[in-house]
Amino acid sequence: MSIILGIDPGSRITGYGVIRQVGRQLTYLGSGCIRTKVDDLPSRLKLIYAGVSEIITQFQPDFFAIEQVFMAKNADSALKLGQARGVAIVAAVNQDLPVFEYAARQVKQTVVGTGGAAKSQVQHMVRTLLKLQANPQADAADALAIAITHCHVTQNSMQMSESRLSLARGRLR
């Protein structure tokens, strides 16, 4: 059993999603958004750090998964996003959580089946996969999709390792 915290970073809205994985079964534990309503960036970063730290304390995750920075058209926005990611990662590292990073296209490919999926498609598939009553907020859905991607990637890695081990055992006999 593992608890995974997914983070969709943003300097104004940071989405989070927490799921439990037991084998191939995923269970929704919680999700939401950290909203920073102050104008100055240092204060927003402080709120993101405090919010992520509080979520980690509340849910006690085993793994921390976060979206990688993508190249934005606006350099200033990309820098702010990078700083928001940074404080979220520091919150995880300060609580000794292993950090995993996933590209947005990989997350969409894993959850929806296409790397160019729309936010509404991600919301729908997250709702379906986690058997939720309603679509989560867009940023929370993205964070849950990041957590689901981590489960999928680690599950596939374990299966590949087991297959290699079985092959090696077969050769040794």
UniProtKB/Swiss-Prot annotation:
Residue positions binding Mg(2+) 1? D8, D139
Q: Where does Mg(2+) 2 bind?
A: E67
The residues responsible for catalysis, as annotated, are D8, E67, D139
PROSITE patterns in the record, alphabetically?
Answer: RUVC
The cofactor note from the UniProt entry for this protein is:
Binds 2 Mg(2+) ion per subunit.
Q: What are the protein's UniProt keywords?
A: Cytoplasm, DNA damage, DNA recombination, DNA repair, DNA-binding, Endonuclease, Hydrolase, Magnesium, Metal-binding, Nuclease
Organism superkingdom: Bacteria
> Any idea of its EC number?
3.1.21.10
Instruction: Supply the InterPro entries for this chain.
Output: RNaseH-like_sf, RNaseH_sf, X-over_junc_endoDNase_Mg_BS, X-over_junc_endoDNase_RuvC
Q: What class does this enzyme belong to in the EC scheme?
A: hydrolase
Q: Gene Ontology terms, cellular component aspect?
A: cytoplasm; Holliday junction resolvase complex
**Per the record, a Pfam family?**
RuvC
Q: What is its main location?
A: cytoplasm
What intrachain disulfides are recorded?
A: none
Q: Which GO terms describe its molecular function?
A: crossover junction DNA endonuclease activity; DNA binding; magnesium ion binding
What family does the database annotate?
Belongs to the RuvC family.
Summarizing the function annotation, the protein's role is: The RuvA-RuvB-RuvC complex processes Holliday junction (HJ) DNA during genetic recombination and DNA repair. Endonuclease that resolves HJ intermediates. Cleaves cruciform DNA by making single-stranded nicks across the HJ at symmetrical positions within the homologous arms, yielding a 5'-phosphate and a 3'-hydroxyl group; requires a central core of homology in the junction. The consensus cleavage sequence is 5'-(A/T)TT(C/G)-3'. Cleavage occurs on the 3'-side of the TT dinucleotide at the point of strand exchange.
Give the protein's recorded name: Crossover junction endodeoxyribonuclease RuvC
The protein's gene is named ruvC
